[in-house]
Amino acid sequence: MRYALLIYASEQEWANQAEEESQAQFQEYMAFTKDIVDRGIYKSGEALQATATATTVRVRDGETLTTDGPFAETKEQLGGFYVVEAKDLDEAIEIAVRIPDVRRGSIEVRPVMEIDMPS
């Protein structure tokens, strides 16, 4: 089964990291990603730009409304994600606890819906 591992942490903390800490964390992410690729469980993943670059889109009464930034202000922001293949939730959690930002933020583990798309 595929699981989305959604990485939440404080953008403020990311921005205030010392350069050495930032580089060390980047290397941790590269090692983690290489490991899950080598194990054949990596399906996709991306880092996201800061919430200041986001636009939220809604349609109300047929009118398209856009707002700069995320829809909800929270202490932790979605900073990236991985999609991995795991046999069950326990294995997905075992993978999630190795993501570097789990030590300062949180990782939401969510099963991906399996939908057969028509050809």
Report the location of each language-model feature:
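Conserved, structured core segments of small domains
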Residues: 1-119
